[in-house]
């Protein structure tokens, strides 16, 4: 039975180079984790008696902190989701955007928490559809990308960064990350004639937690991050956070989405959406327990119903970055550059047509 519980979730990814400090879980969250294990045991007992199980729903998690930490954070919510939809839910928690993208390509993910470019690709290329979007307590429709540096000199001013980027060591997110790469590149670096991939002394690529730690510990000089993850970082690593300052922040970026495979019938997707939008909205002990779950889960306020149109801003950002890169790249001739720009525009138009349909 213990082996069954272990196998109910994806195998743990390699340990982070900067493991998160794990505070004791709130009582409500701990009870939900115990309930998740009990649910798995009961399910295993039923299957052992020869009854055919419902197919497991495989849930993929965008890597925001460590893989193990992310899985622990999501387990209570997914245990509640499992009860609501009447199916077991397993967790795939990975250490990189690329690993999650590959799992989606291999059809190993049925439902996922994604943001920006990854959600856009899942909808436009991988037959998934948006059912809900995260909300936060500040009430804003999004978050902002940040550039972080240490407070102490010498690498602590925006003017210094712009003047001599080749002296700075960069810690950034993967190329699919909106706040970790796409938005800083599009809104700050390229307008200042700096290409993130080539102008810095060195670079480290990792999660927002890893990039912030790299700067705080002197392993890098400037890091991409975002307002939501930096607030969480301040709670988990107060000593390291006290060494950091914000050099720059972006325009608002739309919050992350939850996507489900279109292969599932509409009634199943509606059931998932109904569960998410009602979660933590009720009064009393149940609502309090659910709000405790969301607080431990990146301090979410809840979820709102959404469809593929919520990805229109992400599509625009991705197309703008692709055009900027095409304009600044070296080409054999101008005709080759124009051909690339035309392909970008055609792809963008096709994406808009898919997204404006909303999904069904």
List the predicted regions and their residue ranges.
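Bacterial N-terminal signal peptides
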Residues: 33-45
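An extracytoplasmic/periplasmic, membrane-proximal ligand-sensing/linker region
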Residues: 65-66, 72, 76, 271-360
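Bacterial N-terminal signal peptides that target proteins for export
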Residues: 4-35
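Periplasmic-binding protein-like
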Residues: 58-63, 136-146, 238-273, 291-307
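A ligand-binding cleft/hinge motif common to bilobed small-molecule-binding domains
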Residues: 116-126, 189-190, 216-217, 221-242
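Bilobed "Venus flytrap"/periplasmic-binding protein-like clamshell domains
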Residues: 54, 58-82, 94, 140-213
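Short helices/loops that flank or line small-molecule/ion binding pockets
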Residues: 98-112, 125, 143, 208-223
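Boundary at the C-terminal end of the N-terminal hydrophobic targeting segment
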Residues: 46-50
